[in-house]
Structures are given as structure tokens and as C-alpha cells.
């Protein structure tokens, strides 16, 4: 497996006009907290057309989703998984893409988008969640790593 190419994932999503907001580790980086991340976390607009575009991008980079014992790799199957409104982790040739939805403490796409900032991540212009939304999601997740991230975010003084 090659090193993740998160810039390529972001570029493909942007070029396909997928409506998304970056959250998670890459958003931390955008707000000045440097830490490794093993996936691209995004919240997407939940309309069928947008999910179809996202699934097409996933299929093009050999994405597959684990569903119980099986794994699904067609655009239709991936779109179906996304339409369930639950979190979907898509393993691709370029790295892991985590579509965060249906989790406690994660605002809707519209809310996140409204408060987001346009910024460059890895040379790609994307919408990144606000620092307040990022802190709220980290608090809600509450894992040890998230609490450490919160301290680091506070230390940036933003």
C-alpha cells in the first residue's frame, strides 16, 4: 500500500463537484494543530445527486466499503451505503475516506458549511469546519486522542 495521497482524494472530490466539509485530522491541521491522520474525514451534503457523485469518485479510485462480511465496490453499492445516513469508511487506492454522518455531536452538512472557512489543504481549496464546530465534535467524541486534540486546539489561541 502506498502512502495515502489525501491531496488526490480532495482534488477528485472537488473536481467532481462533491459538496463536502473537511472535519477530523485534516481540519485540525488547517487550524494549526499538527498531527498525523490516517484518513480524510468529511461531512457531505446528503442529497442523492451529491452522494452519487461521491460514490463515482470512490469507485474511480477503487473504493470499497465493508458491509458485514462482504465488501462493496460498485458505485451503486457505495451510494446505497451512503444513503443509509450512517458513517461510511471507504478504503481506496489513495487512502481511507471517512464519510462522517449520523453520529452524535456532528452537525448537519448545512450547518457546518454555513460556518466553514474556505482554505487550502495540501494545495486544494476546500471548505473546512469552523474551529468551534471542530472543538464541539472533539468534545462529543470524547476519546483520549480527541481530548488531547482539544488541548492542542486551545493552545493555538484561536
Describe the predicted segments one by one.
Residues 1-158:
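Compositionally biased terminal segments of proteins
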Amino acid at each position: 500500500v502506498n502512502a495515502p495521497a489525501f491531496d488526490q482524494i480532495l482534488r477528485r472530490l472537488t473536481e467532481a463537484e462533491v459538496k463536502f466539509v473537511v472535519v477530523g485530522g485534516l481540519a485540525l491541521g488547517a487550524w494549526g494543530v499538527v498531527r498525523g491522520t490516517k484518513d480524510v474525514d468529511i461531512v457531505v451534503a446528503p442529497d442523492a445527486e451529491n452522494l452519487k457523485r461521491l460514490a463515482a469518485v470512490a469507485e474511480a479510485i477503487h473504493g470499497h466499503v465493508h458491509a458485514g462480511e462482504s465488501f462493496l465496490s460498485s458505485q451503486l453499492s457505495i451510494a446505497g451505503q451512503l444513503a443509509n445516513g450512517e458513517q461510511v469508511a471507504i478504503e481506496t487506492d489513495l487512502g481511507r475516506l471517512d464519510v462522517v454522518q449520523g453520529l452524535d455531536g456532528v452537525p448537519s452538512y448545512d450547518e457546518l458549511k454555513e460556518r466553514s472557512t474556505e482554505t487550502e489543504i495540501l494545495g486544494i481549496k476546500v471548505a473546512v469546519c469552523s474551529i468551534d464546530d471542530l472543538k464541539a465534535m472533539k468534545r462529543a467524541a470524547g476519546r483520549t486522542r480527541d481530548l488531547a486534540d482539544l488541548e492542542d486546539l486551545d493552545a493555538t489561541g484561536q
